[in-house]
Amino acid sequence: MSKVAPHLLIVDDDKELCSLLSKFLSRHGYRVSVAHNGSEMASILEASRVNLVILDLMLPGEDGLVLCRRLRATSTLPIIMLTAISDETDRIIGLEMGAD
């Protein structure tokens, strides 16, 4: 019986970063899907079983904190917040919104 690779969802509007992360994680045995905004994230989550979401803080439209709060309201899916900002306040807010 073969083991199914964990499925990760990267949500980030930076296509170059998504490509880099996707290639790296795929080489390490993960299945990876990519969304560039909240709408794409919702579509992927509805269509597939995902084991972990890697969510950017700064997205066009709804930001990562809003998406994290919405996801946390209906799911216990692990969420890792990803950001280029190193502001302690944003980290605290992310944890309060339910990021892991």
Question: Which residues does each predicted region cover?
Answer:
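N-terminal/domain-start alpha-helical segments
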Residues: 1-100
